């Protein structure tokens, strides 16, 4: 059965089976932030424009099945148009590199936020008095943050009371729960 144009990965059928593992692992390398495969290695199989579609389709496929955490049966259903050698190769790649793809997807999500905390420092100070009240005896937290935004590190300094610190901690704990749910 010939794969139909428009089904996932139909262009992969042109690839000789012995080149499948090499191509798929290089595409996963690209997803993980390393080098994607180069057209020169596959110019005898696909035209230039078709090559771009191959890369895009396979990368989307891997991201989708790992991101959705699809079971093997559902993955095989999506691959039923391909020959058994290509199906087997894809499944081996997915099983062996699933964790790497998942980490790459997490990094992509984290990178959506343009600002990232690079470093921090804190001190607790005791305010003994102010110009309005003779004796305060109130603990204050001085928090110094180095935030990387658009490649540039910007320093921020914040002074907080006990209540403000408690609110910050609660917000950070809530954000941490969301991050843990993404893993």
UniProtKB/Swiss-Prot annotation:
Molecular-function GO term, any one: NF-kappaB binding
Tissue: Widely expressed with highest expression in thyroid.
Biological role: Scaffold protein in the commander complex that is essential for endosomal recycling of transmembrane cargos; the commander complex is composed of the CCC subcomplex and the retriever subcomplex. May modulate activity of cullin-RING E3 ubiquitin ligase (CRL) complexes. May down-regulate activation of NF-kappa-B.
GO cellular component entries: cytosol; nucleoplasm
Keywords: Cytoplasm, Nucleus, Transcription, Transcription regulation
Residues covered by the COMM domain: 116-183
Matching InterPro entries: COMM, COMMD4/6/7/8, COMMD8, COMMD8_HN
Keyword Cytoplasm found: yes
Family, similarity comment: Belongs to the COMM domain-containing protein 8 family.
Entry protein name: COMM domain-containing protein 8
Gene expressing this chain: COMMD8
One GO process term, biological-process aspect: signal transduction
Protein's UniProt keywords contain Kinase: no
Pfam families attached to this UniProt entry: COMM_domain, COMMD8_HN
Subcellular localization, as worded in the UniProt entry: Cytoplasm; Nucleus
Quaternary assembly: Component of the commander complex consisting of the CCC subcomplex and the retriever subcomplex. Component of the CCC (COMMD/CCDC22/CCDC93) subcomplex consisting of COMMD1, COMMD2, COMMD3, COMMD4, COMMD5, COMMD6, COMMD7, COMMD8, COMMD9, COMMD10, CCDC22 and CCDC93; within the complex forms a heterodimer with COMMD4. Interacts with RELA, RELB, NFKB1/p105. Interacts with CCDC22, CCDC93, SCNN1B, CUL1, CUL2, CUL3, CUL4A, CUL4B, CUL5.
């Amino acid at each position: 059965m010939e794969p139909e144009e428009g089904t996932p990965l139909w262009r992969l059928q042109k690839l000789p089976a012995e080149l499948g593992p090499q191509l798929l692992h290089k595409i996963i390398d690209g997803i993980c932030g390393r080098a994607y495969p180069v057209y020169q290695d596959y110019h005898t199989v696909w035209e230039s424009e078709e090559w771009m579609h191959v890369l895009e389709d396979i990368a989307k496929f891997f991201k989708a099945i790992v991101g959705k955490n699809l079971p093997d049966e559902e993955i095989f259903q999506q691959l039923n148009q391909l020959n058994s050698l290509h199906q087997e190769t894809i499944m081996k790649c997915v099983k062996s590199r699933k964790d790497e793809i998942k980490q790459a997807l997490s990094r992509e999500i984290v990178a959506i936020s343009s600002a990232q905390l690079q470093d921090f420092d804190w001190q607790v100070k005791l305010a003994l008095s102010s110009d309005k009240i003779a004796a305060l005896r109130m603990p204050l937290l001085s928090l110094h943050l180095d935030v990387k935004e658009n490649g540039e590190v910007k320093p921020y300094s914040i002074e907080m009371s006990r209540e403000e610190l408690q609110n910050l901690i609660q917000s950070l704990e809530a954000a941490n729960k969301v991050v843990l749910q993404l893993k």
